[in-house]
């Protein structure tokens, strides 16, 4: 995919000497490139550009790559303020620069061997602020598909068309679930009424399962003194992913990226006996993480999120049973939503990367061994992922493959011996001495944002009746004649706790029916002359075109309650 980025950069540089490049990357089979020039592109130009790009790949003689220092890289891009900014923001010591003729390009993960013969299809052009910051200049973004044969390109285009139908970003707009606005900021989702209802339905189900599992609900602030995150180690190991500190009353405060430090302090409010262990806390936690703007993908990766967070404080002899129970809880809850995970990872630390993980080899050996033994006891197939652990401990990650063929983590179990040490957490054991508990972090469905993104892609927005934000829509045939009866039916259904809308637009019946289909509302109730005479008998139609049926009001309510 990055070969497509290079070809587009070369074409732009040859045509516009002063072009400047912003972020680039790929999602599945689709690449994108941000750039700044004093000319606006349109899709009408794509055919000519595609022809130029496809012929360009055969003319790349003499192309080469070289690793250089930051100072040398900056000198190559002296007149490109955006690339210079990106170079400075990266954490790299060496930079892979690609040279072609007298031009140079920075595409860090590019492999030249893939550029032999190209077939490119450009998909769209849009505008966005550099790094998602409204105070910055607007850049143009071109998305495209790169292939090495015509047959492959045709297949990728076909797959892309199918993906668009399932893309959670377009479905979110179509179903009026969520939106984004540059005045609020990149990666900061706005939940609309239907999306908020969907969140509440999901949350209510998960909260009930948490209660059955023995979790106590707590609530803690989104802000904390910077010292809290220094004690926990987040400031040292996670600072680059946290929002900058805010100065309040001469104190440095930070938006939390995780809830565990807060829950450690909640546990510390009381001295527990070994008989009262484990202690299980749950919270719908609002978190803020400063994700790179180029990595923001709809709800899948955002900067403000709500995590259904759970922490188990237990004795060492309870670790295995608590992890097994948490594993089964995750499977049970996600099965209700139709999820079968594509992969389960055992995420381990990388002993060569001491800056990313705590330096305690003995602790890592013990915690990683315990996690692996649990997976073996459960007879679970898993894949080891070196370097994917949390900085404080190993994880079991439940992975879902998106429509862009990218694995994302939906649920997780993490084992943590570190934070009890950091916060000096203790309980009283049988011998009346103080012992350190162990923390098990459990994300049953992860964040609402990512879970709903995955749910939309899995269902194409066709939610089962129990999960649909709007279960039924009432459609009066004629506003003048039938609206009064439709309103009466609407109020009757509301009293029965049915999630129902009333379409009181002046449009023709056929248009209202089409709109209900677009919004994927499971049931349509048509109110005409028959219903005016008797609202105890309803005319019902499924949005997928099921046969129109006559059903009593009571049986309709029973059906919705049964299936919903």
Swiss-Prot record:
One of its GO terms (biological process) is threonyl-tRNA aminoacylation. It is an enzyme of class 6 (ligase). It holds the Pfam family tRNA-synt_2b. Its main location: cytoplasm. GO terms for cellular component: cytoplasm. PROSITE patterns: AA_TRNA_LIGASE_II (PS50862). SUPFAM superfamilies: Class II aaRS ABD-related (SSF52954), Class II aaRS and biotin synthetases (SSF55681), ThrRS/AlaRS common domain (SSF55186). Transmembrane segments: none annotated. Belongs to the class-II aminoacyl-tRNA synthetase family. Catalyzes the attachment of threonine to tRNA(Thr) in a two-step reaction: L-threonine is first activated by ATP to form Thr-AMP and then transferred to the acceptor end of tRNA(Thr). Also edits incorrectly charged L-seryl-tRNA(Thr). This is Threonine--tRNA ligase. It comes from Mycoplasma genitalium (strain ATCC 33530 / DSM 19775 / NCTC 10195 / G37).
